[in-house]
Amino acid sequence: MANGIYKITEDFEKSLSDYTGAPYVVTVDNQSNALFLALMFENVKGKEITIPARTYPSVPCEIIHAGAKIKFAPVEGKTLKGAYQLAPTNVWDSALCFTADMYKPGTHMCVSFTGPYKHFKLSKGGAILTDNLEAYHWFKRARYSGRRECSYHDDNFDMLGWNFYMMPELAARGLLLMNQFYNLDGTKKYNADLELPYPDLSKFEIYKQ
């Protein structure tokens, strides 16, 4: 249970859970780091992961940072639409998908609130949607330098983490903006998947490590 200024982050996560249908939600500073944490939890080091050849460049970066290798799948046309699996893992890149009841059971769905094209224009930020309680607790500590939700004067440090947490003021803004995804009668609004053009990343040697 969060306390102090970080309680607002927990409230925002609860609102995302209610809207998306995910049992657990962990917010982070951006969606690229959400993908990285999900891949690290799934221990993908040394494995081959297949992604669309046309996607945002940070996706192959995070796969490589997590210790895996990339296999690019051909894409018809020059655009990418909606969410896709980082196969064969249960990690999904959902940067182009944010809608009511979107959560797919058994997955870690990584959503994005960054940039002018997203449905949720929070300027910055991302989240991991999951139904895995063990992963939920790991993500919460991993994003916060391995810390538990207490003062670092009282913590027992036994985990190496990263500084990926969402700033409380951004979570507060997100909580206020959640109203846009509900109708006046309280029912949820559904958003169409986004479709955006991306370069063919399979042409670049840097991703073939």
Where do the model's predicted regions map?
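Phosphate-binding glycine-rich loop
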Residues: 10-49, 62-66
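Short glycine-enriched loop/turn motifs at secondary-structure junctions
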Residues: 2-3, 19-20, 119-123
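Active-site region of PLP-dependent enzymes
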Residues: 98-100, 104, 108-209
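PLP-dependent aminotransferase-like
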Residues: 39-101
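Structural signal for conserved beta-strand scaffold positions within catalytic alpha/beta enzyme cores
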Residues: 27, 72-74, 110-112
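A glycine-/small-polar-enriched, mobile loop at the entrance of the PLP active site in fold-type I
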Residues: 1-10, 179-182
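Short alpha-helical
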Residues: 33, 57-58, 134
